[in-house]
Amino acid sequence: METLQMKEAALVYLDRSGGLQKFIDDCKSYNDSKQSYAVYRFSILIDPCDVVELDADLGNHILHHPLKAARVFQSVCFVAVKTLSLIGQLQTETQINIVLKLTHLPALPSYTLDLCEFPLNYASQRFYMMQGIVIAMTTITKYTQGARFLCSDGVCPLSKGFQYVRVHVPGATESATVRNDFLCSLCSSSLQEDRKFRVLGDKQIVEIITTKMFHAFQGDSKNQPFRFQSLGIFLRDELVNKMKIGNEYKIIGIPVCVKTSQTALCVEANNITPHTAKVPLGISDNFRRLLSLTSSSCWKFTAMLANVFASQIVAPGTYNLLKLCLLMSLVQTRDCNREREDCLDILVITSDTLLVDRLLNFSMNLVSRGIRHPVCTEVFPTVSRNKYGTGAVSIQAGSALLAKGGICFIGDLTSHKKDKLEQLQSALESRSVTVFIPGKKFGDDFDQQMTFPIQCSFWSFVDMDSSSRRNVQKTSTLIGQMDCSLIPANLAEAFGLLINCSEASPCHPLLPTVQHTLKKAVEPEGLLYLASKQFTTEDFEKLLAFAKSLNMEFSLEAERMIHGYYLASRRIRTDSIHGSKLSASALKYLVSLSEAHARLSLRTTVLREDALIAALLLEISLTLRYGATPFCVAPNALFPFELYNEEYLEQRDLYLTQCQQQLQQFIATCGPGTTVFSSDE
């Protein structure tokens, strides 16, 4: 009686939800094919809340006994097929394979599988929801979705028809569906598979880790030790290729144990949805007040941000150029589910690697996908054998793909081997990496290759002290040019920004750094400056998250200035032997830098003031590589004065206004065919 009531409820739900009409349409497709199948597979979308409201018993079966619930729907669908004559070829109920796809699970702790908790409840054979980031995935292989068996005794009535049909159920291995020791229930003779009726489906395995685990990659020693492990997710049929390496997903599935060389916990996925991070509604009150006080200028707010940023690591007012570039790189990070390529890569030349390392590590942790590349692992994807014994090849993410939509901090550039640097240069130039899969090595007839987009910004630094010890520095004959002989010139060019923080640069104030170090030694956990109390790390995290969410558009003046500077700079840096020293990617960096400064200023329109900052930053980098041009930008052009009070901010604005006029003159002189309008025009 209870089963009959659940069947009635299932039919009512299918009718109300539109599932019955979809089922009829699917049946029509099977019937029109005029082909006889061993298994007819139907996917039914289920909203657990709606089912529970309709019938509590059926809802309970769907949530806690999904295999029994599937049999209820199987019976209902079989009756519907026979009553309405939907599929003429269908003979038995066992031929119908019902897959219940859940839209969601109740928001209760008992339905959540936390990969950091122990023990994991995986024996109940019911649905759980888990959330994680894909760190590895296999190539696609086939599995047996369903098979038809016949009694080997020709006299037996079951030697014909579709009485023995086996279908894959969640958690079952291939041998559970197809093997040679099945016996006939009528005469006990062995069953033989009718191979022409075998139905194959696609299968893929991905590995995920919980988001909490990212603390292990961020170099934050304050975090307490915790347990985590990767979890294998089996994707089948329509779910194959729905997950990408580096992306974060919410997964509904049934935990199972797979016994290979060792028992491994896996999940048979039922439904997957991309995880979307929540965007903060605004910024902190202190930043809001600062924005209001500096609203008369397009440059003051970002100058103050750079001035007070990371006061836990360096004294306010020091390393301002580097801090501004870091903030601009951070606001250009994006939700990893968006396909964007406006990253800002930064290479720092320094003689104080410890301080720069701390500063970059601190900044990286302000975004959710900040990865500090461990020396013992690979930056880019690698190939290995699949540990689940399915014959597929497993592709491991590497730090670059794990940092998708964020920052990949690879440390000292000189610590990497030559082949890795060449791979890095290729990835920076193409924003993609290709993985080669040799077929002979992994038991396949053909070689394969897979290409993955690189959607993170790379940060690195070069130790000038090690450079002077290993090589005799070359004396440059060009004004402003710096010796970067320790790293290949093409690799240095592939980084969008080259920042000089050596002792000779204005970005390396010695006395404030010494004072800060001494204060920090006395009070390691203390807030040494008022700025640390007024603008906390949480305030900066909120500011960056809000700035990243802004939708930007370019003003006509900004576009003209960007294109004008690019053409003029490209023309002036061209010689008859080597051609232009300015690559086509420089235009992309100019656009990205302009957008980043406008975003950091919390504006939705890129102005020519933002284009000026972009041009100055790129010109400083180009001068370090190739020497100065008639534009002649000073190394400290963005911060010519120490920002003590409002008067110094005003002087900086006047200086930048002069730089803007100088840039317009440079464009007019060296970039023929480019029009730059004054504010009056």
UniProtKB/Swiss-Prot annotation:
Disruption phenotype: Mutant mice are viable and show no overt phenotype. However, both males and females are sterile. Males fail to produce spermatozoa, and formation of primordial follicles is disrupted in females.
Phosphoserine PTM sites in chain numbering: S292
Keyword terms, alphabetized: DNA damage, DNA repair, Meiosis, Phosphoprotein
Coiled-coil segments on the chain, per record: none
Pfam families reported for this sequence: MCM_lid
Free-text tissue specificity from the UniProt record: Predominantly expressed in the gonads and the brain. Not detected in the heart, lung, nor embryonic fibroblasts.
UniProt cross-references to Gene3D superfamilies, sorted A to Z: P-loop containing nucleotide triphosphate hydrolases
Single GO molecular function: DNA binding
GO BP term, example: meiotic recombination nodule assembly
Highest taxon of the lineage: Eukaryota
UniProt keyword annotation of DNA damage present: yes
Domain MCM: 533-621
Task of the protein: Plays an important role in meiotic recombination and associated DNA double-strand break repair.
PANTHER family: DNA REPLICATION LICENSING FACTOR MCM FAMILY MEMBER, MINICHROMOSOME MAINTENANCE DOMAIN-CONTAINING PROTEIN 2
Name of the protein: Minichromosome maintenance domain-containing protein 2
Gene name for this UniProt entry: Mcmdc2
